């Protein structure tokens, strides 16, 4: 019965996305304090951009999803095990919108992180009826866990806003400059807090204006 209910929810949500879109988040208007956009090279070198969101802070998660839906973009959302149950409604929305779901685990050792990943994997399969090997783990543990079959997120750009004092325009400028130094692929990590929700519409706009393609993050392509 639970499986049928979730299947119906995902089907209804997917159908609702095919109707004419309604306005989502309105991009913040620039204020006089916003830094002007620095001119960037027009040639992006076809750098693929992947968007990852760590969901230990989910206060802005619904707004993050609104921004991605409005721009027809996808990302991967990394949840700690307890967050999967706490945000189950938004989890179903994420799955129904074509995003990927991964696990966030940060143990003191690789063994401790592995146990957290296993717990999260069981929780996700129980409430979401899906499995994943995508994981956001401490840098020093990534190689060991990859050898065990986990597909670990390799952050190349920390795109989490410094705080509410940083304007969306200034933040987007800084992220674009960091991407410019990447080759082939850039892995942007944001969180799902209110500040990330605030800056994301402008960041997506700037990525589009610079012709950076945002690729769909999959377990077979990260």
Report the location of each language-model feature.
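Sec-exported extracytoplasmic/periplasmic mature domains
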Residues: 69-73, 95-99, 122-129, 150, ...
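Structural recognition of the beta-strand scaffold that forms the well-ordered cores
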Residues: 50-52, 75-79, 100-105, 132-137, ...
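Catalytic grooves of carbohydrate-active enzymes
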Residues: 59-61, 171-220
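Alpha-helical scaffold elements lining the catalytic groove of polysaccharide deacetylases
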Residues: 107-128, 141-184, 196-202
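Charge-rich, solvent-exposed alpha-helical interaction surfaces
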Residues: 5, 9-12
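Active-site beta->alpha N-cap acidic-glycine motif
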Residues: 13-119, 123, 222
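Short, polar loop motifs at secondary-structure junctions
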Residues: 138-142, 220
């Amino acid at each position: 019965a639970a499986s049928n209910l979730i299947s119906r929810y995902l089907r209804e949500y997917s159908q609702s996305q095919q109707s004419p879109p309604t306005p989502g988040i309105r991009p913040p208007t620039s204020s006089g304090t916003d830094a002007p956009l620095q001119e960037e090279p027009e040639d992006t070198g076809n750098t693929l951009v992947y968007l990852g969101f760590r969901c230990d802070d989910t206060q802005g998660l619904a707004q993050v999803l609104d921004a991605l839906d409005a721009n027809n973009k996808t990302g991967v959302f990394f949840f700690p095990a307890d967050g999967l149950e706490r945000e189950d409604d938004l989890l179903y929305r994420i799955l129904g919108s074509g995003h990927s779901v991964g696990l966030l685990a940060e143990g003191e050792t690789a063994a401790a992180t592995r146990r957290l990943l296993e717990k999260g994997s069981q929780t996700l399969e129980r409430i979401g009826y899906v499995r994943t090997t995508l994981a956001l783990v401490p840098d020093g543990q990534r190689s060991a866990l990859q050898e065990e079959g986990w597909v670990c997120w390799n952050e190349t750009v920390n795109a989490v806003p410094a705080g509410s004092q940083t304007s969306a325009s200034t933040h987007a400028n800084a992220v674009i400059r960091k991407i410019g130094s990447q080759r082939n692929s850039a892995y942007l990590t944001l969180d799902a807090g209110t500040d990330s929700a605030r800056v994301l519409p402008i960041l997506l706009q700037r990525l589009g204006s610079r012709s950076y393609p945002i690729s769909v993050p999959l377990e077979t392509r990260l």
